[in-house]
């Protein structure tokens, strides 16, 4: 029996997404800005629509919640475009918020992958 083939592009994009979940990275405006496309926008789990600069400002003020993610699935939609979906649980003290998440990553003309769109949907 052979191991399933891995796609290095999909693996790379999943690793970038996981970086964005790291609390140390999330508090580093420059690190997050490097991972987000200038045209980034998000439909947040809370229902808030976030644009690039507003999200960068908000992450600097974020609480000390932990985010655990699993169930990652990545699909190459076109050359230079990847859809990533997964489940997350955000925990702060005794409160857990579950979400279904999707992100669209695009490869820029400089060859770097950046998140263009993200959506968080509340989950049971």
Each predicted region: which residue ranges?
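A beta-strand edge to alpha-helix "cap/lid" segment located at domain peripheries
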Residues: 2-34, 39-124
């Amino acid at each position: 029996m052979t191991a399933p083939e891995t796609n290095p592009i999909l693996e790379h994009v999943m690793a970038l997404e996981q970086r964005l979940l790291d609390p140390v990275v999330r508090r580093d405006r420059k690190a997050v800005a490097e991972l987000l496309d200038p045209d980034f926008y998000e439909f947040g789990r809370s229902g808030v629509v976030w644009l690039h600069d507003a999200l960068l400002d908000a992450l600097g003020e974020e609480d000390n919640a932990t985010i655990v993610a699993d169930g990652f699935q990545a699909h190459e939609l076109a050359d230079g475009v990847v859809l990533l979906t997964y489940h997350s649980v955000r925990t702060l003290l005794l409160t857990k918020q579950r979400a279904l998440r999707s992100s669209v990553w695009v490869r820029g003309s400089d060859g770097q992958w950046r998140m263009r769109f993200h959506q968080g949907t509340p989950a049971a």
